[in-house]
Amino acid sequence: MLRLGRSAASEVSSIRNSLQLQLEQRGARPMQCAYQTQSHSNPEGAKRGRSPMSLAVMGAAALSVGLELQTDGIAQARAAMEPGTQLQRHKWQLFDQIGAGAFGVVRLGMHEESGEVAAVKIVPLENPNDQRSYPALEREIAALKLVKALGGHNSIVDLRDVYVEGRKLFLVTELARGGELFEQIVAYGSFPELKARDVAREMASALSFMHRHGLVHKDVKPENILMSARVVDHNSGVYRKSNRHESSSLVKLADFGSAGPASVNTNLEDIGTAAYLPPEVLNSGMCTSACDMWALGCVLYIMLSGSHPFDLDGMSADSVVEHRVKSEPVTFDFSAWDNVSPHAKDLISKLLVKDPTLRLTADQMLQHPWMNASAEAAAAGLRRPSPLLAGQPIPRGPA
Protein backbone atom coordinates (compact mmCIF):
# COMPACT_ATOMS: atom_id res chain seq x y z
CA MET A 1 0.00 0.00 0.00
CA LEU A 2 2.53 2.57 1.18
CA ARG A 3 6.20 1.89 0.75
CA LEU A 4 9.02 2.34 3.18
CA GLY A 5 11.19 5.40 2.66
CA ARG A 6 14.26 7.00 4.12
CA SER A 7 16.69 5.29 6.47
CA ALA A 8 17.10 6.09 10.15
CA ALA A 9 18.44 9.52 11.04
CA SER A 10 22.18 9.87 11.72
CA GLU A 11 23.25 9.63 15.36
CA VAL A 12 25.17 12.61 16.69
CA SER A 13 27.58 11.39 19.37
CA SER A 14 28.60 14.81 20.66
CA ILE A 15 27.71 18.41 20.11
CA ARG A 16 30.76 20.23 18.89
CA ASN A 17 33.91 18.13 18.78
CA SER A 18 32.58 15.25 16.73
CA LEU A 19 31.01 17.52 14.12
CA GLN A 20 34.11 19.61 13.70
CA LEU A 21 36.34 16.52 13.64
CA GLN A 22 34.11 15.03 10.98
CA LEU A 23 34.51 18.11 8.83
CA GLU A 24 38.26 18.24 9.35
CA GLN A 25 38.60 14.61 8.28
CA ARG A 26 36.73 15.40 5.10
CA GLY A 27 38.67 18.57 4.45
CA ALA A 28 35.42 20.50 4.41
CA ARG A 29 34.44 23.81 5.94
CA PRO A 30 31.12 24.47 7.63
CA MET A 31 28.81 26.64 5.60
CA GLN A 32 27.76 29.79 7.41
CA CYS A 33 24.03 30.41 7.58
CA ALA A 34 24.09 34.19 7.31
CA TYR A 35 21.84 36.90 6.00
CA GLN A 36 24.13 38.28 3.31
CA THR A 37 21.99 39.45 0.43
CA GLN A 38 23.98 41.33 -2.16
CA SER A 39 23.22 44.89 -3.16
CA HIS A 40 24.68 44.70 -6.64
CA SER A 41 22.20 44.41 -9.48
CA ASN A 42 21.48 41.09 -11.15
CA PRO A 43 18.70 39.79 -13.41
CA GLU A 44 17.00 37.88 -10.60
CA GLY A 45 17.31 40.67 -8.08
CA ALA A 46 15.74 43.11 -10.47
CA LYS A 47 12.50 41.17 -10.38
CA ARG A 48 10.18 42.82 -7.90
CA GLY A 49 7.44 40.20 -8.05
CA ARG A 50 7.16 38.11 -4.90
CA SER A 51 7.53 34.35 -5.08
CA PRO A 52 4.91 32.08 -3.52
CA MET A 53 7.33 31.46 -0.68
CA SER A 54 7.57 35.18 -0.02
CA LEU A 55 3.81 35.23 0.44
CA ALA A 56 4.07 32.19 2.70
CA VAL A 57 6.65 33.88 4.90
CA MET A 58 4.57 37.05 5.13
CA GLY A 59 1.45 35.00 5.78
CA ALA A 60 3.19 33.32 8.68
CA ALA A 61 4.25 36.74 9.96
CA ALA A 62 0.66 37.96 9.76
CA LEU A 63 -0.44 34.96 11.82
CA SER A 64 2.23 35.65 14.43
CA VAL A 65 0.96 36.16 17.96
CA GLY A 66 3.75 38.54 18.89
CA LEU A 67 6.67 36.35 19.87
CA GLU A 68 9.53 38.81 19.71
CA LEU A 69 12.33 36.52 18.59
CA GLN A 70 10.35 34.80 15.87
CA THR A 71 8.57 37.97 14.77
CA ASP A 72 11.97 39.52 14.18
CA GLY A 73 12.99 36.42 12.24
CA ILE A 74 9.94 36.66 9.98
CA ALA A 75 10.51 40.37 9.45
CA GLN A 76 14.08 39.66 8.43
CA ALA A 77 12.94 36.88 6.14
CA ARG A 78 10.46 39.24 4.52
CA ALA A 79 13.17 41.87 4.08
CA ALA A 80 15.51 39.29 2.60
CA MET A 81 13.12 38.84 -0.29
CA GLU A 82 13.80 42.40 -1.38
CA PRO A 83 16.98 42.97 -3.42
CA GLY A 84 19.60 45.34 -2.08
CA THR A 85 18.90 44.67 1.61
CA GLN A 86 21.61 43.98 4.17
CA LEU A 87 20.48 41.81 7.09
CA GLN A 88 21.96 40.62 10.36
CA ARG A 89 24.05 37.48 10.14
CA HIS A 90 22.61 34.35 11.74
CA LYS A 91 24.93 32.15 13.73
CA TRP A 92 24.09 28.66 12.50
CA GLN A 93 26.62 26.42 10.79
CA LEU A 94 25.38 23.67 8.48
CA PHE A 95 26.71 20.11 8.45
CA ASP A 96 25.56 16.69 7.21
CA GLN A 97 22.23 16.07 5.53
CA ILE A 98 19.98 13.95 7.76
CA GLY A 99 16.75 13.92 5.77
CA ALA A 100 15.05 14.84 2.52
CA GLY A 101 11.58 15.21 1.08
CA ALA A 102 9.55 16.98 -1.56
CA PHE A 103 10.18 20.31 0.20
CA GLY A 104 13.99 20.11 0.13
CA VAL A 105 16.49 18.75 2.64
CA VAL A 106 17.17 18.68 6.38
CA ARG A 107 20.71 19.20 7.63
CA LEU A 108 22.38 19.29 11.00
CA GLY A 109 23.00 22.81 12.22
CA MET A 110 25.14 24.03 15.10
CA HIS A 111 24.79 27.38 16.85
CA GLU A 112 28.18 29.08 16.95
CA GLU A 113 27.79 30.52 20.44
CA SER A 114 25.81 27.94 22.43
CA GLY A 115 27.00 24.80 20.63
CA GLU A 116 23.41 23.62 20.31
CA VAL A 117 22.80 21.17 17.48
CA ALA A 118 19.49 21.58 15.66
CA ALA A 119 17.64 20.32 12.61
CA VAL A 120 17.60 22.80 9.73
CA LYS A 121 14.98 22.38 7.04
CA ILE A 122 16.11 24.11 3.84
CA VAL A 123 13.43 25.00 1.30
CA PRO A 124 14.12 26.61 -2.11
CA LEU A 125 12.11 29.81 -2.45
CA GLU A 126 11.28 29.26 -6.10
CA ASN A 127 10.47 25.75 -7.27
CA PRO A 128 7.68 25.60 -9.86
CA ASN A 129 7.23 21.87 -9.29
CA ASP A 130 6.46 22.27 -5.59
CA GLN A 131 3.90 25.06 -5.45
CA ARG A 132 1.73 23.11 -3.02
CA SER A 133 4.56 22.93 -0.49
CA TYR A 134 4.40 26.67 0.14
CA PRO A 135 1.02 26.69 1.92
CA ALA A 136 2.23 23.72 3.95
CA LEU A 137 5.34 25.62 5.00
CA GLU A 138 3.24 28.66 5.87
CA ARG A 139 1.05 26.48 8.08
CA GLU A 140 4.07 24.90 9.74
CA ILE A 141 5.73 28.21 10.55
CA ALA A 142 2.50 29.73 11.85
CA ALA A 143 1.68 26.69 14.01
CA LEU A 144 5.17 26.44 15.51
CA LYS A 145 5.19 30.17 16.24
CA LEU A 146 1.81 29.89 17.94
CA VAL A 147 2.94 26.95 20.08
CA LYS A 148 6.09 28.85 21.05
CA ALA A 149 4.18 32.03 21.90
CA LEU A 150 1.82 30.04 24.12
CA GLY A 151 4.77 28.85 26.17
CA GLY A 152 5.59 25.72 24.20
CA HIS A 153 5.13 22.11 25.18
CA ASN A 154 7.83 19.65 26.15
CA SER A 155 6.53 17.03 23.69
CA ILE A 156 6.18 19.35 20.70
CA VAL A 157 9.24 20.13 18.61
CA ASP A 158 10.46 23.66 19.42
CA LEU A 159 11.07 26.35 16.81
CA ARG A 160 14.54 27.82 17.19
CA ASP A 161 14.77 30.18 14.21
CA VAL A 162 13.39 30.96 10.77
CA TYR A 163 15.19 33.06 8.18
CA VAL A 164 15.97 33.52 4.51
CA GLU A 165 19.42 33.49 2.93
CA GLY A 166 19.76 34.03 -0.79
CA ARG A 167 16.82 32.21 -2.35
CA LYS A 168 16.32 29.63 0.40
CA LEU A 169 14.27 29.57 3.56
CA PHE A 170 15.79 27.98 6.67
CA LEU A 171 13.51 26.57 9.36
CA VAL A 172 15.50 25.65 12.47
CA THR A 173 13.96 23.33 15.06
CA GLU A 174 15.30 21.35 17.97
CA LEU A 175 16.96 18.08 17.05
CA ALA A 176 15.40 14.79 18.14
CA ARG A 177 18.33 12.38 18.18
CA GLY A 178 16.40 9.13 18.33
CA GLY A 179 14.84 9.37 14.87
CA GLU A 180 11.24 8.58 14.00
CA LEU A 181 8.96 6.39 16.09
CA PHE A 182 8.25 4.56 12.83
CA GLU A 183 11.92 3.66 12.44
CA GLN A 184 12.08 2.39 16.02
CA ILE A 185 9.15 0.04 15.40
CA VAL A 186 10.61 -1.18 12.11
CA ALA A 187 14.01 -1.83 13.69
CA TYR A 188 13.03 -3.25 17.06
CA GLY A 189 9.44 -4.43 16.83
CA SER A 190 6.43 -3.55 18.93
CA PHE A 191 6.82 -1.72 22.24
CA PRO A 192 6.24 -3.15 25.71
CA GLU A 193 3.17 -1.58 27.28
CA LEU A 194 5.22 0.48 29.71
CA LYS A 195 7.09 2.29 26.94
CA ALA A 196 4.04 2.53 24.68
CA ARG A 197 2.22 4.19 27.56
CA ASP A 198 5.02 6.73 27.98
CA VAL A 199 4.77 7.68 24.32
CA ALA A 200 0.97 7.73 24.37
CA ARG A 201 0.88 9.88 27.49
CA GLU A 202 3.23 12.48 26.03
CA MET A 203 1.36 12.58 22.73
CA ALA A 204 -2.01 12.90 24.47
CA SER A 205 -0.61 15.74 26.57
CA ALA A 206 0.76 17.50 23.46
CA LEU A 207 -2.57 17.14 21.64
CA SER A 208 -4.48 18.34 24.70
CA PHE A 209 -2.32 21.47 24.71
CA MET A 210 -2.92 22.08 21.01
CA HIS A 211 -6.65 21.38 21.11
CA ARG A 212 -7.18 23.74 24.06
CA HIS A 213 -5.78 26.50 21.88
CA GLY A 214 -7.80 25.63 18.79
CA LEU A 215 -4.99 23.95 16.86
CA VAL A 216 -5.42 20.56 15.16
CA HIS A 217 -2.31 18.72 13.95
CA LYS A 218 -4.11 16.77 11.18
CA ASP A 219 -1.20 14.43 10.42
CA VAL A 220 -0.42 12.37 13.52
CA LYS A 221 1.46 9.21 12.51
CA PRO A 222 4.60 7.31 13.58
CA GLU A 223 6.73 9.17 11.03
CA ASN A 224 5.81 12.51 12.66
CA ILE A 225 6.59 11.43 16.21
CA LEU A 226 10.30 11.83 16.91
CA MET A 227 12.27 10.12 19.67
CA SER A 228 14.26 12.51 21.83
CA ALA A 229 16.87 9.88 22.71
CA ARG A 230 18.36 6.78 21.18
CA VAL A 231 17.57 3.21 22.24
CA VAL A 232 19.99 1.58 24.66
CA ASP A 233 18.16 -1.63 25.61
CA HIS A 234 15.81 -2.76 22.84
CA ASN A 235 14.03 -5.37 24.97
CA SER A 236 13.29 -3.20 27.98
CA GLY A 237 12.68 -0.06 25.97
CA VAL A 238 15.36 1.93 27.81
CA TYR A 239 16.50 5.18 26.21
CA ARG A 240 19.45 7.41 26.94
CA LYS A 241 20.05 11.13 26.64
CA SER A 242 23.52 12.48 27.08
CA ASN A 243 23.48 16.20 26.37
CA ARG A 244 22.46 19.32 28.22
CA HIS A 245 20.56 20.58 25.16
CA GLU A 246 18.34 17.50 25.00
CA SER A 247 14.77 17.58 26.22
CA SER A 248 13.50 15.67 29.23
CA SER A 249 10.63 14.32 27.13
CA LEU A 250 10.75 10.95 25.41
CA VAL A 251 9.07 12.02 22.17
CA LYS A 252 8.34 15.13 20.11
CA LEU A 253 5.37 15.75 17.85
CA ALA A 254 6.70 17.21 14.59
CA ASP A 255 5.77 18.17 11.01
CA PHE A 256 3.07 20.81 11.31
CA GLY A 257 2.59 21.31 7.57
CA SER A 258 -1.07 20.26 7.82
CA ALA A 259 -1.83 21.96 11.14
CA GLY A 260 -4.51 24.57 11.60
CA PRO A 261 -7.95 25.17 13.08
CA ALA A 262 -10.74 22.63 12.79
CA SER A 263 -12.27 22.65 9.32
CA VAL A 264 -15.23 21.36 7.30
CA ASN A 265 -15.11 20.32 3.66
CA THR A 266 -11.38 19.85 4.07
CA ASN A 267 -9.26 19.28 0.99
CA LEU A 268 -7.70 15.87 1.60
CA GLU A 269 -4.54 16.98 -0.22
CA ASP A 270 -3.94 19.53 2.54
CA ILE A 271 -4.12 17.15 5.48
CA GLY A 272 -2.94 13.89 6.82
CA THR A 273 -1.95 10.56 5.37
CA ALA A 274 -4.59 8.24 3.96
CA ALA A 275 -3.98 5.37 6.39
CA TYR A 276 -4.56 7.63 9.41
CA LEU A 277 -7.67 9.55 8.35
CA PRO A 278 -10.88 8.84 10.32
CA PRO A 279 -14.28 8.04 8.78
CA GLU A 280 -15.65 11.58 9.11
CA VAL A 281 -12.81 13.02 7.04
CA LEU A 282 -13.21 10.37 4.35
CA ASN A 283 -17.00 10.81 4.30
CA SER A 284 -17.44 14.56 4.55
CA GLY A 285 -14.08 16.28 4.90
CA MET A 286 -14.80 17.32 8.50
CA CYS A 287 -11.51 17.57 10.42
CA THR A 288 -11.64 18.44 14.11
CA SER A 289 -9.56 17.56 17.15
CA ALA A 290 -11.25 14.14 17.03
CA CYS A 291 -9.22 13.42 13.88
CA ASP A 292 -6.00 13.64 15.87
CA MET A 293 -7.37 11.22 18.45
CA TRP A 294 -8.29 8.65 15.79
CA ALA A 295 -4.79 8.89 14.37
CA LEU A 296 -3.26 8.53 17.84
CA GLY A 297 -5.38 5.39 18.29
CA CYS A 298 -3.82 4.01 15.10
CA VAL A 299 -0.35 4.90 16.39
CA LEU A 300 -0.99 3.16 19.71
CA TYR A 301 -2.26 0.06 17.90
CA ILE A 302 0.92 0.00 15.79
CA MET A 303 3.18 0.49 18.81
CA LEU A 304 1.65 -2.47 20.63
CA SER A 305 1.32 -4.88 17.70
CA GLY A 306 3.63 -3.74 14.90
CA SER A 307 0.69 -3.64 12.45
CA HIS A 308 -1.77 -1.02 11.25
CA PRO A 309 -5.34 -1.63 12.56
CA PHE A 310 -6.89 -1.49 9.08
CA ASP A 311 -3.97 -2.86 7.06
CA LEU A 312 -2.53 -5.73 9.06
CA ASP A 313 -0.13 -6.97 6.39
CA GLY A 314 0.76 -3.52 5.07
CA MET A 315 -0.12 -4.54 1.52
CA SER A 316 -3.72 -3.35 1.07
CA ALA A 317 -4.71 -0.77 -1.51
CA ASP A 318 -5.83 2.65 -0.27
CA SER A 319 -9.39 1.94 -1.39
CA VAL A 320 -9.49 -1.25 0.69
CA VAL A 321 -8.13 0.51 3.77
CA GLU A 322 -10.66 3.32 3.29
CA HIS A 323 -13.51 0.80 3.17
CA ARG A 324 -12.29 -0.87 6.37
CA VAL A 325 -11.93 2.46 8.15
CA LYS A 326 -15.50 3.40 7.27
CA SER A 327 -17.17 0.03 7.80
CA GLU A 328 -15.19 -2.50 9.83
CA PRO A 329 -14.49 -2.55 13.58
CA VAL A 330 -10.98 -2.71 14.93
CA THR A 331 -9.87 -6.26 15.76
CA PHE A 332 -7.34 -7.76 18.15
CA ASP A 333 -7.66 -11.32 16.85
CA PHE A 334 -4.05 -12.21 16.12
CA SER A 335 -1.12 -13.41 18.17
CA ALA A 336 0.56 -10.04 18.70
CA TRP A 337 -2.29 -9.11 21.04
CA ASP A 338 -2.19 -12.28 23.16
CA ASN A 339 -0.18 -10.67 25.96
CA VAL A 340 -1.54 -7.13 25.71
CA SER A 341 -3.72 -6.04 28.62
CA PRO A 342 -7.51 -5.64 28.27
CA HIS A 343 -7.20 -2.00 29.38
CA ALA A 344 -4.89 -1.24 26.45
CA LYS A 345 -7.33 -2.80 23.99
CA ASP A 346 -10.20 -0.90 25.59
CA LEU A 347 -8.41 2.42 25.17
CA ILE A 348 -7.65 1.74 21.52
CA SER A 349 -11.26 0.73 20.89
CA LYS A 350 -12.46 4.02 22.39
CA LEU A 351 -10.04 6.00 20.23
CA LEU A 352 -11.06 4.17 17.05
CA VAL A 353 -14.79 4.77 17.46
CA LYS A 354 -16.38 5.61 14.10
CA ASP A 355 -18.53 8.42 15.55
CA PRO A 356 -16.24 11.38 16.38
CA THR A 357 -18.67 12.66 19.04
CA LEU A 358 -18.15 9.41 20.99
CA ARG A 359 -14.38 9.27 20.55
CA LEU A 360 -12.20 10.01 23.56
CA THR A 361 -10.72 13.49 23.77
CA ALA A 362 -7.06 13.96 24.69
CA ASP A 363 -8.01 14.86 28.26
CA GLN A 364 -10.30 11.83 28.54
CA MET A 365 -7.54 9.61 27.18
CA LEU A 366 -5.19 10.85 29.91
CA GLN A 367 -7.76 9.75 32.51
CA HIS A 368 -8.24 6.25 31.07
CA PRO A 369 -7.28 3.40 33.46
CA TRP A 370 -4.57 2.08 31.14
CA MET A 371 -2.82 5.45 31.11
CA ASN A 372 -2.61 5.32 34.90
CA ALA A 373 -1.86 1.62 35.38
CA SER A 374 1.07 0.57 37.54
CA ALA A 375 4.42 0.11 35.85
CA GLU A 376 4.67 -3.44 37.18
CA ALA A 377 1.44 -4.52 35.52
CA ALA A 378 2.45 -2.99 32.21
CA ALA A 379 6.05 -4.16 32.02
CA ALA A 380 5.26 -7.83 31.46
CA GLY A 381 6.55 -9.17 28.16
CA LEU A 382 9.42 -8.07 25.94
CA ARG A 383 9.25 -6.45 22.55
CA ARG A 384 7.82 -8.67 19.84
CA PRO A 385 9.54 -8.83 16.43
CA SER A 386 8.22 -6.36 13.92
CA PRO A 387 6.09 -7.83 11.10
CA LEU A 388 8.53 -6.04 8.79
CA LEU A 389 11.14 -8.64 9.66
CA ALA A 390 8.78 -11.26 8.25
CA GLY A 391 8.06 -9.24 5.12
CA GLN A 392 4.85 -7.67 6.44
CA PRO A 393 5.40 -3.88 6.35
CA ILE A 394 3.21 -1.48 8.23
CA PRO A 395 1.99 1.45 6.13
CA ARG A 396 4.22 4.45 5.77
CA GLY A 397 3.12 7.86 4.58
CA PRO A 398 4.91 9.82 1.88
CA ALA A 399 8.00 11.78 2.84
UniProtKB/Swiss-Prot annotation:
Entries under InterPro entries matching the protein: Kinase-like_dom_sf, Prot_kinase_dom, Protein_kinase_ATP_BS, Ser/Thr_kinase_AS
Molecular function, one GO term: protein serine/threonine kinase activity
Membrane-spanning intervals of the chain: none
Inducers of expression: Up-regulated by exposure of sporangia to cool water, which initiates the cleavage of sporangial cytoplasm into individual zoospores.
Start and end residues of each stretch annotated as Disordered: 30-50
PROSITE patterns assigned to the protein according to its UniProt record, in alphabetical order: PROTEIN_KINASE_ATP (PS00107), PROTEIN_KINASE_DOM (PS50011), PROTEIN_KINASE_ST (PS00108)
Source organism, top-level taxon: Eukaryota
The keyword Transferase is assigned to this record: yes
Keywords associated with the record: ATP-binding, Kinase, Nucleotide-binding, Serine/threonine-protein kinase, Transferase
Active site: 219 (proton acceptor)
Annotated positions binding ATP: 98-106, 121
A Pfam family this chain is assigned to: Pkinase
Catalytic activity: L-seryl-[protein] + ATP = O-phospho-L-seryl-[protein] + ADP + H(+); L-threonyl-[protein] + ATP = O-phospho-L-threonyl-[protein] + ADP + H(+)
Domain Protein kinase, chain residue ranges per copy: 92-371
EC number: 2.7.11.1
Quaternary structure annotation from Swiss-Prot or TrEMBL: Interacts with BZP1.
Function, as annotated: May regulate an early stage of the zoospore pathway.
Record family assignment: Belongs to the protein kinase superfamily. CAMK Ser/Thr protein kinase family.
Protein name: Serine/threonine-protein kinase PKZ1
